[in-house]
């Protein structure tokens, strides 16, 4: 995955991609399969490959034609799952193919934007794992490119395809909660061995041969150049050069659905806080983190998560008339991953609530975790219909505003102010 685009020259480089790459895009017939490539074949890439294969098994309207990965052992393992697919180390070589319709991007965060932009310029639709990009500036470039090329982009926030958030949106719009003034959520867990401390193959590296070879220079791309570091390669989420830590990995999952439930708008003010309170393994990203954002629609969203305590705040939408209590979406303590929500009236409105509904609280069924497959199916459905997917580029961009600025707030010790277009006023 070689990339010569520097951070400083990112916008100019993105604008010039179309001159270097010939635009193509097949027009799919009713019986045509969506020719799909997977770029990045670590844990998440293999998970998404499985979802694509499930789609193929159920609908037979797609096929995986190409796989790309810089670590040879991962590439070989994935190739065994898809015997007919051609393998690549360089994504640029993969994108020279004339038959591609869709690209699934499952690399570390710092590669999301460069590969997505290159795929869009080739006329491909893109499913990109969350976060949409590594930085807010990159997200603005990507959303502009999606519009310019009239492509489909799905950001990998599975919950945006669940029935849960469509029901929540309907309840919010019905006025049952009154004016929603605050939302809170969490994505917490407790790993005493160190979250993201995935297994390391000590034999793997840039000097190794065969299956153990890693093309470290390509993996680094535009990130700061350094000697090979196995911890950075196998556990990239621990380091700022390749990830935003809890914010980009976990909070993105919570903030995007809140944008669906309320309004999809850029926040007006963002702060991030927390710290590296427990882990002492050389990581840079905090093990406990809070994202807080105010919005032009006059409400606030807070997401508080930890990797060393699983009891995060309850998932709530707090209105002037009632509060909606939702179960945790992912992980957390047993018993909180419920598919049932409760709407409980505020004390001053309890009598009116009882008169209207005939009960002192409303139980909402079927608002739990619907899994991952619906989101991948939504992407392929939209590739064919040309309708906007559930976590489209505009949603991904506006969510990225809150996510990236919370990281910058934490790292720079400042609160960021944003205008309605997403421009950071004091950045």
Which residues fall in each region the model found?
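C-terminal helical cap and adjacent loop that interface with cofactors, partners, or active-site loops
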Residues: 13-14, 47, 230, 243-262, ...
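N-terminal Rossmann-like dinucleotide-binding module
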Residues: 13-82, 159-162, 258
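Predominantly a Rossmann-like dinucleotide-binding segment in NAD(P)-dependent oxidoreductases
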Residues: 40-48, 149-154, 159-271, 276-282, ...
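Beta-strand-loop-alpha-helix segment that lines the small-molecule cofactor/substrate pocket
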Residues: 113-161, 175, 413
């Amino acid at each position: 995955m070689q990339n010569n685009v520097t951070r400083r020259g990112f916008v100019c480089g993105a604008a010039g991609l179309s001159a270097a790459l010939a635009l193509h895009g097949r027009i799919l017939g009713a019986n045509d399969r969506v020719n799909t490539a997977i770029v990045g074949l670590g844990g998440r890439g293999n998970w998404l490959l499985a979802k694509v294969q499930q789609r193929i098994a159920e609908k037979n309207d797609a096929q995986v034609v190409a796989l790309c990965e810089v670590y040879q052992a991962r590439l070989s393992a994935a190739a065994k799952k898809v015997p007919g697919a051609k393998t690549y180390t360089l994504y640029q070589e993969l994108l020279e193919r004339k038959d591609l319709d869709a690209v699934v991007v499952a690399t570390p965060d710092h590669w999301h934007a460069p590969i997505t932009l290159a795929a869009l310029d080739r006329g491909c639709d893109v499913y990109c794992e969350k976060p949409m990009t590594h930085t807010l500036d990159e997200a603005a470039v990507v959303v502009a490119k999606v519009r310019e090329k009239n492509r489909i982009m799905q950001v990998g926030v599975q919950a945006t395809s669940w029935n849960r958030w469509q029901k929540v949106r309907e309840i919010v719009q019905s006025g049952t909660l009154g004016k929603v003034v605050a939302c809170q959520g969490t994505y917490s867990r407790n790993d005493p061995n160190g979250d993201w401390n995935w297994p390391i193959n000590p034999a793997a590296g840039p000097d190794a041969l065969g299956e153990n070879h890693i093309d470290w220079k390509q993996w680094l791309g535009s990130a700061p150049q350094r000697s090979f570091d196995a911890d950075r390669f196998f556990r990239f989420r621990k380091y700022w050069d390749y990830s935003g830590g809890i914010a980009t990995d976990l909070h993105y999952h919570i903030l995007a659905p809140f944008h669906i439930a309320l309004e999809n708008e850029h926040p007006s003010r963002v702060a991030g806080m927390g710290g590296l309170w427990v882990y002492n393994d050389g990581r840079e990203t905090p093990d406990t983190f809070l994202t807080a954002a105010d919005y032009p629609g006059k409400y606030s969203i807070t997401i508080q998560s930890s990797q060393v305590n699983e009891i995060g705040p309850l998932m709530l939408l707090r209105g002037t008339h009632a509060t909606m209590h939702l179960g945790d979406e992912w992980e957390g303590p047993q018993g909180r991953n419920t598919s049932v929500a409760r709407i409980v009236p505020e004390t001053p409105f309890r009598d009116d609530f009882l008169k209207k509904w005939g009960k002192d609280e409303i139980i909402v069924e079927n608002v739990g975790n619907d899994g991952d497959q619906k989101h991948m199916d939504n992407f392929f459905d939209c590739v064919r219909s040309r309708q906007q997917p559930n976590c489209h580029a505009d949603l991904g961009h506006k969510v990225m505003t809150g996510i990236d600025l919370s990281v910058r707030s934490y790292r720079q010790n400042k609160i960021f102010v944003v205008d309605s277009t997403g421009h950071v006023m004091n950045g």
